[in-house]
């Protein structure tokens, strides 16, 4: 974990030096973002309302909060509702030949970024990436999509949205509660009641219940591992029975969550190593690991390692799960969003 993240989330002693130094920049960040929101509120800037409904999945802070599993969940849910979803993303970490860039079966994370490739490989859904989310969405609508799911983009106010889901890390929550760069927040806690649903990833009874806004709890369920080289799938219980120990790597926004998940499933992790989010893996990154011990990684990291993977490398797919009542609430809100555009 980087020092600044320790200051944000772990009450590191360096906070007494760094936070006062960074507070003036946070004040400037607040001023700029406030003026930007105000320009939309009073009509100086205008949001673009698309011809099809838009669902935005985002967060008010930085780092991995669990947005991608929810995007995957919404893709499957909207399909069950008879819709043809398309996903738009910034494509962070990728460099496409042009924008908006429509992914195909040959697209790589080098061009499109990590998450879009993961989503495409898992769901075979149309995906367009680019900083201009409106252009990306229009490209997908032209391809026949009748509902747009935006992976991130909560602060992209130029894109009007019909349903807004905010994801919160149920364990780390909001860190020290300060705006960037003194804290991890892009927007203050005032933003939560203005969204349609707040989803807490990982239960925190004290902080997510009895709020003055609609909120729910989700968990990330893992039942099997997938081999990077062969595609073989094996249940976690069977894998653990066959393997006493594993190594693990994670290059995501919150790598400790992945390591904790492995330990919760009773894996004995011998060596674990974290990398910065969106790290571009090369084979040399794995030199210190014993090839005789299985190496486990996230699905997001796996999309960048297929070209040089070894036979003992596995990734852990996870799925967002909700209670029946919360699932029905998501369905109801989605149907309302769709009907509001049709009318």
Curated annotation (Swiss-Prot):
GO aspect biological process, one term? lipid A biosynthetic process
Q: Which Pfam families match?
A: LpxK
Biological pathway: Glycolipid biosynthesis; lipid IV(A) biosynthesis; lipid IV(A) from (3R)-3-hydroxytetradecanoyl-[acyl-carrier-protein] and UDP-N-acetyl-alpha-D-glucosamine: step 6/6
Question: Which top-level enzyme class is recorded in the Swiss-Prot or TrEMBL entry?
Answer: transferase
- Which residues are noted in the entry as ATP-binding? 61-68
Is Membrane one of the keywords UniProt gives this record?
no
Entries under InterPro entries matching the protein = LpxK, P-loop_NTPase
SUPFAM superfamilies on file: P-loop containing nucleoside triphosphate hydrolases
Provide the alphabetized UniProt keywords. ATP-binding, Kinase, Lipid A biosynthesis, Lipid biosynthesis, Lipid metabolism, Nucleotide-binding, Transferase
EC number annotated for this UniProt entry: 2.7.1.130
Q: Which GO terms describe its cellular component?
A: plasma membrane
- Can you name one GO molecular function term for this protein? tetraacyldisaccharide 4'-kinase activity
Q: Does the keyword section mention Lipid metabolism?
A: yes
Q: Which domain of life is it from?
A: Bacteria
Instruction: Provide the reaction this enzyme catalyses.
Output: a lipid A disaccharide + ATP = a lipid IVA + ADP + H(+)
NCBIfam families in the cross-refs: lpxK (TIGR00682)
Please report which protein family the annotation says this sequence is part of: Belongs to the LpxK family.
Q: What is this protein called?
A: Tetraacyldisaccharide 4'-kinase
Q: What is the lineage of its organism?
A: Bacteria, Pseudomonadati, Pseudomonadota, Gammaproteobacteria, Alteromonadales
Q: Which gene encodes it?
A: lpxK
């Amino acid at each position: 974990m980087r020092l600044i993240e320790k200051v944000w989330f772990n009450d590191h002693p360096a906070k007494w030096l760094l936070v006062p130094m960074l507070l003036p920049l946070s004040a400037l960040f607040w001023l700029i973002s406030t003026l930007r929101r105000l320009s939309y509120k009073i009509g100086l800037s205008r949001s673009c309302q698309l011809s099809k409904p838009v669902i935005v999945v985002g967060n008010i802070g930085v780092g991995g909060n669990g947005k991608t599993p929810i995007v995957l969940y919404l893709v499957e849910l909207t399909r069950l509702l008879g819709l043809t979803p398309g996903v738009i993303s910034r494509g962070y970490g990728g460099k496409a030949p042009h924008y908006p860039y429509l992914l195909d079966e040959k697209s790589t994370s080098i061009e499109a970024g990590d998450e879009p490739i993961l989503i495409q490989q898992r769901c075979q859904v149309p995906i367009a990436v680019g900083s201009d989310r409106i252009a990306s969405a229009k490209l997908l609508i032209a391809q026949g999509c009748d509902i747009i799911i935006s992976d991130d983009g909560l602060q992209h106010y130029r894109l009007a949205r019909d349903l807004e889901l905010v994801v919160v890390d149920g364990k780390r929550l909001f860190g020290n509660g300060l705006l960037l760069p003194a804290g991890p927040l892009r927007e203050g806690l005032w933003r939560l009641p203005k969204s349609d649903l707040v989803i807490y990833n990982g239960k925190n009874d004290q902080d997510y219940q009895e709020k003055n806004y609609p909120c729910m709890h989700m968990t990330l369920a893992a039942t099997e591992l997938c081999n990077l080289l062969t595609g073989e799938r094996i249940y976690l219980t069977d894998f653990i029975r066959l393997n006493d120990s594993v190594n693990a790597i994670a290059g995501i926004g919150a790598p400790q969550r992945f390591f904790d998940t492995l330990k919760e499933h009773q894996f004995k992790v011998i060596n674990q190593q974290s990398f910065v989010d969106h790290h571009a893996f090369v084979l040399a990154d794995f030199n210190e690991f014993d090839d005789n011990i299985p190496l486990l990684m996230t699905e997001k990291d796996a999309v960048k390692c297929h070209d040089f993977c070894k036979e003992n490398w596995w990734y852990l797919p996870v799925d967002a799960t909700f209670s029946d009542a919360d699932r029905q609430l998501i369905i109801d809100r989605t149907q309302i969003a769709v009907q509001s555009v049709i009318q």
